[in-house]
Amino acid sequence: MSEEGPQVKIREASKDNVDFILSNVDLAMANSLRRVMIAEIPTLAIDSVEVETNTTVLADEFIAHRLGLIPLQSMDIEQLEYSRDCFCEDHCDKCSVVLTLQAFGESESTTNVYSKDLVIVSNLMGRNIGHPIIQDKEGNGVLICKLRKGQELKLTCVAKKGIAKEHAKWGPAAAIEFEYDPWNKLKHTDYWYEQDSAKEWPQSKNCEYEDPPNEGDPFDYKAQADTFYMNVESVGSIPVDQVVVRGIDTLQKKVASILLALTQMDQDKVNFASGDNNTASNMLGSNEDVMMTGAEQDPYSNASQMGNTGSGGYDNAW
């Protein structure tokens, strides 16, 4: 591993996909970045649905679940508060975005209801959030349901900020490819084969970026992976480049919180040795407070509020 520090080489980039090589880092760091990009970048998603009228063939819960999985624009999500940190009773413009949907089957044929039919009624205050992500050529978005003549669907959705650790609907990435040691020099992969592993296991496209092993070379027990091939695909709620950038930023904050806790622990030990009993008596409590600083550190603090919001047509978009 070089002492130059982490290096990134972009191999391919598009609107929804970026392929890059991350080098001069160890396996733990590369895998931490992968996990953070998958589950710890905040986005906006529909969290609860109030159904006023539903005469379709689909149950309220079924439609609520489909609504929850619709990607919503989350570019300015940092300007939105977590609902658990907001001082409002249920939801407000500072912690949520309210969308409405009203559709009626008027034609003799089937009427399709798409995510484009969702209308934002909240005051966005200039923030780029809440709009359904529409990527198809027709500009319709996600199909929510189908209506026959005379059927009606009328509902109100409340979208809130969250991370994929709470529910997959808040995940910003559709898929993340992750590979290292394509020639299997480190023997981390045990190939299963019938006759010849070289013929039955096709080579990865990443093999061309590394030298093949020489036949007869001794195995290096001290060798470690330091080059990782990653491909990130976004669902559209956040641009794919921001998925990577915000993943790095989130990982830095998590490491910083640990460093802060360790630093304070060392300071408490110094104070204890010098006879500061007040500080020493609060060592355990203060360390716990530092570790739980920030909304991202405790995504389950409102676990008791994650059930159904009550009767009267409310359903969680889970």
From Swiss-Prot:
<dbReference type="GO" id="GO:0006368">
    <property type="term" value="P:transcription elongation by RNA polymerase II"/>
</dbReference>
<dbReference type="InterPro" id="IPR036643">
    <property type="entry name" value="RNApol_insert_sf"/>
</dbReference>
<comment type="function">
    <text>DNA-dependent RNA polymerase catalyzes the transcription of DNA into RNA using the four ribonucleoside triphosphates as substrates. Component of RNA polymerase II which synthesizes mRNA precursors and many functional non-coding RNAs. Pol II is the central component of the basal RNA polymerase II transcription machinery. It is composed of mobile elements that move relative to each other. RPB3 is part of the core element with the central large cleft and the clamp element that moves to open and close the cleft. Seems to be involved in transcription termination.</text>
</comment>
<dbReference type="InterPro" id="IPR001514">
    <property type="entry name" value="DNA-dir_RNA_pol_30-40kDasu_CS"/>
</dbReference>
<dbReference type="GO" id="GO:0006367">
    <property type="term" value="P:transcription initiation at RNA polymerase II promoter"/>
</dbReference>
<keyword id="KW-0007">Acetylation</keyword>
<dbReference type="GO" id="GO:0003677">
    <property type="term" value="F:DNA binding"/>
</dbReference>
<dbReference type="GO" id="GO:0005654">
    <property type="term" value="C:nucleoplasm"/>
</dbReference>
<dbReference type="GO" id="GO:0003899">
    <property type="term" value="F:DNA-directed RNA polymerase activity"/>
</dbReference>
<keyword id="KW-0479">Metal-binding</keyword>
<comment type="similarity">
    <text>Belongs to the archaeal Rpo3/eukaryotic RPB3 RNA polymerase subunit family.</text>
</comment>
<dbReference type="GO" id="GO:0006369">
    <property type="term" value="P:termination of RNA polymerase II transcription"/>
</dbReference>
<feature type="compositionally biased region" description="Gly residues">
    <location>
        <begin position="309"/>
        <end position="318"/>
    </location>
</feature>
<feature type="binding site">
    <location>
        <position position="95"/>
    </location>
    <ligand>
        <name>Zn(2+)</name>
    </ligand>
</feature>
<feature type="binding site">
    <location>
        <position position="92"/>
    </location>
    <ligand>
        <name>Zn(2+)</name>
    </ligand>
</feature>
<dbReference type="GO" id="GO:0005665">
    <property type="term" value="C:RNA polymerase II, core complex"/>
</dbReference>
<feature type="compositionally biased region" description="Polar residues">
    <location>
        <begin position="299"/>
        <end position="308"/>
    </location>
</feature>
<dbReference type="GO" id="GO:0005634">
    <property type="term" value="C:nucleus"/>
</dbReference>
<feature type="modified residue" description="N-acetylserine">
    <location>
        <position position="2"/>
    </location>
</feature>
<feature type="binding site">
    <location>
        <position position="88"/>
    </location>
    <ligand>
        <name>Zn(2+)</name>
    </ligand>
</feature>
<keyword id="KW-0804">Transcription</keyword>
<dbReference type="GO" id="GO:0006366">
    <property type="term" value="P:transcription by RNA polymerase II"/>
</dbReference>
<dbReference type="GO" id="GO:0046872">
    <property type="term" value="F:metal ion binding"/>
</dbReference>
<dbReference type="InterPro" id="IPR011263">
    <property type="entry name" value="DNA-dir_RNA_pol_RpoA/D/Rpb3"/>
</dbReference>
<dbReference type="Pfam" id="PF01000">
    <property type="entry name" value="RNA_pol_A_bac"/>
</dbReference>
<dbReference type="GO" id="GO:0001172">
    <property type="term" value="P:RNA-templated transcription"/>
</dbReference>
<protein>
    <recommendedName>
        <fullName>DNA-directed RNA polymerase II subunit RPB3</fullName>
    </recommendedName>
</protein>
<dbReference type="InterPro" id="IPR022842">
    <property type="entry name" value="RNAP_Rpo3/Rpb3/RPAC1"/>
</dbReference>
<keyword id="KW-0862">Zinc</keyword>
<dbReference type="Pfam" id="PF01193">
    <property type="entry name" value="RNA_pol_L"/>
</dbReference>
<keyword id="KW-0539">Nucleus</keyword>
<feature type="region of interest" description="Disordered">
    <location>
        <begin position="297"/>
        <end position="318"/>
    </location>
</feature>
<dbReference type="GO" id="GO:0046983">
    <property type="term" value="F:protein dimerization activity"/>
</dbReference>
<dbReference type="InterPro" id="IPR011262">
    <property type="entry name" value="DNA-dir_RNA_pol_insert"/>
</dbReference>
<dbReference type="InterPro" id="IPR050518">
    <property type="entry name" value="Rpo3/RPB3_RNA_Pol_subunit"/>
</dbReference>
<comment type="subunit">
    <text>Component of the RNA polymerase II (Pol II) complex consisting of 12 subunits.</text>
</comment>
<feature type="binding site">
    <location>
        <position position="86"/>
    </location>
    <ligand>
        <name>Zn(2+)</name>
    </ligand>
</feature>
<keyword id="KW-0240">DNA-directed RNA polymerase</keyword>
<dbReference type="InterPro" id="IPR036603">
    <property type="entry name" value="RBP11-like"/>
</dbReference>
